[in-house]
Amino acid sequence: MFNKKNNTVRAISVLLSAIVGSNLAVADGTHTPIGEAVNDLPIFDAHVHYKEPAWKPYSVKNVIELMDQNNVAMGLVSSTPDEGTMMLWEFAPNRIVPELRPYHGNVGSSNWTKVPGIENYLRERFEQYPHEGIGEFHIHSLDTTDESLFRRIIEMAKMRDVYLHVHSGPEPIRWLYGLDPEVKIIWAHAGLGESAGAVHALMSEFPALYADTSLREYDILGSNRDIDSEWKKIIIEYQDRLMVGSDTWTNSQWDNYSEIIESNRLWLSKLPRSVAEKIAFKNAQKLFGRMISLNLIGTR
């Protein structure tokens, strides 16, 4: 009887350990990675620019063909000037989610908040075209004298239920949430130069904050070509709030577009299918209310 009881207890203990271990593996994202099957996932490119210097070497047709070649089903596009975004959207409206970037003419990342009439420019473009976000714009250094402008921009975004796409460090993000806790934000490049610890802290502090990981692929992939441990923690904990992106801010990025998408698929391949799918396209599907699938490839 004693041995039978011990065997029963031992069996229950083994079963519980297996269940707990399985749950931890799922929470940790350590169960079977998607591997090469990642190539069969559609990608939503959450950080595309179609700036004027690209228009001649890369026609709108060329851009959509590049997307097709890399199974990029859809892209979030902002441009300098906005006409670039609209050219792409008019050519392939089913493939492009347009954002409204403030930059045009002599208005750029370093002076856009100080240019008279910038608010009117944004309002007029919104009235003319179906933009689904404001950005990507830069806040290089926080200047609280811009508060009134940003309050109006936030109001503009909230009226249309769209996101701000913000290129900045953590403090401007905190400041924007301080102006209005209900503002919707996509953090461009997940902070770019910020440490993984700073990224984790900000994502933890603001549960509604999304981020694109453009230009972060080599931070995410460690020197051994596996996911960096600190980034893995971010990816698993905030898998519902991350999206990949290319950042075609210069023509060299267009030149290397296939390699950029491939590098993003490489780190996604290290993740469980459920996590990889979210970051590749399902989170964007949720944000922008679009059906994203490989059926879009070859269409406009």
Model-found features: residue ranges?
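Acidic/histidine-rich, surface-exposed loop or edge segments in extracytoplasmic proteins
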Residues: P42-Y50, K158
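Catalytic pocket-lining loop regions of alpha/beta-barrel enzymes
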Residues: L100, T144-V244, P272, M291, ...
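Mid-to-C-terminal alpha-helical segments outside catalytic/metal-binding sites
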Residues: F2-R10, V26-F44, S59-M74, S78, ...
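Active-site metal-binding loops of divalent metal-dependent hydrolases
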Residues: V48, F137, A190, L215, ...
